[in-house]
Structure formats: structure tokens, C-alpha cells
Amino acid sequence: MLTMAQWTLIAVLAQLALAGYELWRIHMGLESKRWPQTTGKIGKAWQEDDFVRDIGDEEGTHSVYARYRYRVDARWYDGRRLSYGVTSRVRFNEALDLLHQLRAGGEVDVYYDPGKPQRAVLYPGSSAGNVVLLATWIVGATLTMALR
């Protein structure tokens, strides 16, 4: 049986791991702004309604997804990542903005990592949502330690 101190340690480590992941996403978002671009083709783009609804918000939140193909140095790649920024559980208007240029069969700019061309995004950069999530995990870990 785990002690309260062990549960606290597990909770803090989990929150710090999530903060580390968010920090990586911010870093990759900044890196993606310097990546070269190529032209790709959208295979499919869609949004899904999330089941979690904010109190008083009838629109709820939505997640945006896409599948696309692009070519780098005569080799074809399949991509799924829209951005290192937050593209899930966003407001309806944000989801529509993301989907606006993503029509099946349409061409789209693809930004790829020159050192690892299979890593690509359609929207370079990160978002304020990444910073909010990073801060949330760090504050959560700090409060968990302070309240034990």
C-alpha cells in the first residue's frame, strides 16, 4: 500500500512530465517557424465535437484533425499533425478557422523538419494554449507539494 507521501510524489512527477511535454511542444512550435515549406495535398480534414461542455457554453469544444501527403526530395510522406499549438478542445470559431483552408483534395503549405522530414505541420508555431497548459501543470505540481 502506498503512503500519502508516495502518492504525492507520483502526482507531482506526473504533472512535471506533462509540463515537460508541453515545453517540448512549445519548443517544436518555435522550431517549426524556421522549417522549409513544400506543397501538400489534403486527404481528409474534419472536426469532432468534444463531449465536455463548459458550463454556460452551448457550443462546447471541438477538436480538428487532418490527413495530408507531401513530398520532400522525391519521397512522399503522410502527415497528421496540424500544429504544435493547441488544436483540440478549442472553441467552435477556432475550429472553423483551422478548417477553413483544409478542403479534401486541396493544396496546402506543409512545413517540415529538414533533419526529420516525416515530422511536419500545416500551421507552424505554438499557441497561447500551450503556455496556459504549461503553467497549469507547474502550478499544479507546486500546489500538490505545498499542500501535502
Where do the protein language model's features map onto the residues?
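Oxidizing extracytosolic/periplasmic lumen-facing domains
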Residues: 2-147
